[in-house]
C-alpha cells in the first residue's frame, strides 16, 4: 500500500511515527507531507532528515490536495480536519487521528467532516463521539504516540549528557500554549527547586514566534541554571521527556493524560495566564474552547492553587507516587485506552484488512 501522513504541524509526527514504523516493517510505502506555511522549512529540514523518513514539502492544504489527487495513495492520515475531502475520497481512503487527548471540544468537532475512519483512544471518548456522529466509522485502538514507551523501544533522555544529575528526581514542566502558566513562574524558580532536575518542554509556537519574546526571555533565564534543560524547537517529540521524568507539571495540556497513562504523578496548575484573544470581550472564546462539556482534570492528580504552593505538592507526589494511582487508572481507561504498546499494530491491521 501507498500511505501518506499529512503533517499540518510538526508536532503531529510523534503520533504518526509509531504507525509509520509498523507499516514500514510490513513493507508498505509511507511518506510525510509537511506544510511549509505552518512550519519553518529551514529549521526543520535537518530534523526530518535525521528521522530517516521520506517526506515532501507542500505550501498549504490546497497544494497538499493537488498532490494527493495526483498520487492517489491508498490511505492518507490527517491530524485534523481537511477542507477537500469530497475530492480526496474519490481517489483515496482517509484516516483521522488526533495528536492529543486534551480537554478542548475541538477534539470532537474535527469529526464534523467525516473521514473513512477515525482511530480513537479511550472508552469514554469512543462512546461520546459515536453518540455525536452515529453514521461515521470509529475504531478504538489506543494512543499510538505512547507505543514506543510501552514496547520499550524508547530509551528516554541521557540526563548526564544534558548536563543534569542522574541521581536527582526529574521534573518535567510542559505548559500549554493557551492558557499557559509560563508567565506565573518566576525567573529564578529553578533555584527554588535545586534538589531536582528540571526539563522544560514548551509549545513550539512559544519558541518560534516573535510576539512571545517575553516568554522566550523568561525561558532563557531558566536555561542558565545548572539543574535545567530546555528543549529546543527542533525537539518536537515529547515522548523521550515523558519516559525520563518522575513528575509532570502542566495546566490544561493533553500531556497530563499521557504522563498519567505511564502511572506517574501529575501536578495540575490552577493558575495561568490567557492570551489577549481569550480576555475581556473575547472571554467567550475561552469558554467555547474549554467548554463545560469538555474533559476536566479535577481528579487526575494533585492541584496547585498558585506557584507558592507548588513545591510541597511536588515533594509529596514524588515521595508518594501512588497518591492518585486509582484515579490515573480510571482516566487511562476512559481517555487513553489500552496501554499495551500495540495501538500501531491495531491501526496497521485495520488498514490492511480494509
Q: What feature does the model see in each segment?
A:
Residues 67-69, 111, 192, 240-241, ...:
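Structural alpha-helical scaffold elements that stabilize or flank donor/cofactor-binding regions
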Residues 114-183, 207-208, 323-330:
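A nucleotide-sugar donor-handling region in carbohydrate enzymes
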Residues 4-152:
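Active-site and donor-binding regions of nucleotide-sugar-utilizing enzymes
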Residues 165-244:
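Donor-nucleotide binding loops and adjacent catalytic segments primarily
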Residues 55-60, 229-233, 299-310:
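Short acidic-hydrophobic, aromatic-tinged amphipathic segments that line or gate anion-handling sites
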Residues 140, 254-335:
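Catalytic binding pocket for nucleotide-activated donors in carbohydrate/polymer assembly enzymes
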Residues 76-78, 88-96, 233-282:
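A donor-sugar binding/catalytic signature common to diverse glycosyltransferases
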Residues 339-354:
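C-terminal alpha-helical cap of glycosyltransferases
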